[in-house]
Curated annotation (Swiss-Prot):
Its EC number is 3.7.1.3. It is an enzyme of class 3 (hydrolase). GO terms for biological process: 'de novo' NAD biosynthetic process from L-tryptophan; anthranilate metabolic process; L-kynurenine catabolic process; L-tryptophan catabolic process to kynurenine; quinolinate biosynthetic process. The gene is BNA5. It comes from Debaryomyces hansenii (strain ATCC 36239 / CBS 767 / BCRC 21394 / JCM 1990 / NBRC 0083 / IGC 2968) (Yeast). Pathway: Amino-acid degradation; L-kynurenine degradation; L-alanine and anthranilate from L-kynurenine: step 1/1; Cofactor biosynthesis; NAD(+) biosynthesis; quinolinate from L-kynurenine: step 2/3. The lineage of its organism: Eukaryota, Fungi, Dikarya, Ascomycota, Saccharomycotina. This is Kynureninase.
Amino acid sequence: MSIEQAKKLDECFPTYKEEFEIPTFKSLGIQNDEYEDSTDSIYLCGNSLGLMPKITRTAINDELNAWSERGVESHFRHPGEEKGLTSWVDIDLPLLPLIAPIVGGKENEVAVMGTLTSNLNAMLMSFYKPSGKKTKILFEKQAFPSDYYAFLNAAKIFGYNEDHLIQIEIKEGKTYIETEDIIETITNHQDELALVCFSGIQYYTGQFFNIGEITECAKSFGITVGWDLAHAVGNVPLQLHDWDVDFAVWCSYKYLNSGPGGIAGIFVHEKHTKDNSIEQFKPRLAGWWGNNASDRFKMLEVFDPIKSALSYRQSNPSVIDVVAVKSSLELFKKVGGISELRKKSVELTGFLQALLTSSKYYIKQEETTDRLGFKILSPLNKGDRGCQLSVLFQPHYEEYSKNIMERVNKYLSDHAIVCDERRPDVIRLAPLPLYNTFSETFIAVQRLIEAMDKIAANEI
């Protein structure tokens, strides 16, 4: 592998880096005599926070201008209507045809609202219905802690304790959970499970769970199925409607580049909202923004839910947050959609894998050794992961100054290579097809190997 090969691959796969604001050595506060202050960083951290699309600044300023020029009037009479801007009362509606194809849902099955965990809690209150022996929730061990807290408290609301949470662990000698282990667990616990709710992509290992197969298995036993798509949305193609998923939640500040704490979203299969009559609607955490829009401002004490996922909205959304995520969603459409991006992503992460596995420091997943090196925790099969590779450094040292991962990460940071560390020993590398290139992926691995060489020589 060489930088020349990387450049040839860059000629085959377009980059949209020019559409984004890229942090530089100067903006990151990094002084390195080898580089000009204006040199772009290599940003491999879109799995934690996506970069800012350049058009986001204009989109936000348009709404600040509307606020300053018309105040409350902009809810119904936006000053930018002539150039296609939306009045605030309907600000989120233009996003539905943009997000629906990214998650593989119909427009009436998606809503832009809330935050990831608040949405998960809202879905749990509507879809977690323990009854008789079927009271338990199944999810993976090492799920993102916020999910665990939500599941635990949902169980406690119904009077159950943590014994009603079933978690599948990675088997000894493995680095991720096998699909057959999940299927076996669902089958063995079919009489106890009220809900199955895994991560679409596991945040720590980067594993892309087989959503279709797992959902089909659980549904065959009459079990409700939800998914946390925080690391899947905008990363891999999804087919939530066709997979018959009951509900899903996601955030937008990672692969959808909406900005820190950006507005999130939900999917609710249309079968759950088709009978949203006043008499028959499914109980949920409700609010006025989920009510029939034509009657919303009549302030009636009648909940008449919209016949779509929009009925799960509670309050009017933050206008600034909505237009921020809309900017990025429009980029997805502009470049041909998630399926086109996935083609590049598979090759880009495959290139990253090839570079890492060709190193003398690479240790196979099944190998047991304490030598200096690293393992890839993520599945090596390209179809079983998104863009992220989770790299485990060893041997483990508790002391910060000796810790291999910390020393590698510091060296990368000093060279303006931005990635995500997960203590005690993991660095998550995520080359994104929107704004990362094969050339910078090559350079990033080159720097990583340099760091390992310096550690081996006791130079850092």
